[in-house]
Amino acid sequence: MQIISVINQKGGVGKTTTVINLAAGLSQIDKKILVIDLDPQGNATTGLGLSNMDNSSDTIYGVLNGTREISDVIKKTQFENLDIITSNVDLSGLEVETADDSNRAFILKTKLAAYLNDSRSLYDYVLIDCPPSLSLLTVMALVSSNSLLVPLQTEFFALEGLTQLIKTI
């Protein structure tokens, strides 16, 4: 099972586009894919044809704030073999809401591991679309993943950003 976070603190580098296209491509070769939209902008959600206006508890936000289980919020997409856990703007408040939780960086890892252990054969890949920052959400994705994919533009500032990301990791 590969859990891949597509990460870069810079916006507009193709993280969401990479997640959507990689997920769609892998699903076409009969791999079972779960996309987790961890970006409050919810572009992976809308890019895969779902609404990012859902009730917050029916999204990854509900999982991370403890009101829902992963199995409750997985949604089918129009693509066979491709499911998603959607996101919306309410996710941006999670950092403040969990400020007193010393284990908050591990919430996603714990919940995802429990779900995948119960459903090991359901998915071949989990792809996590990260927000354009080195925030709590990005740290949650980092500790939950066993692989990272870092899209870069071919410019100096992108390389500077990669250096910052490597230091964070």
Regions found by a protein language model. Name each.
Residues 1-169:
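P-loop NTP-binding core
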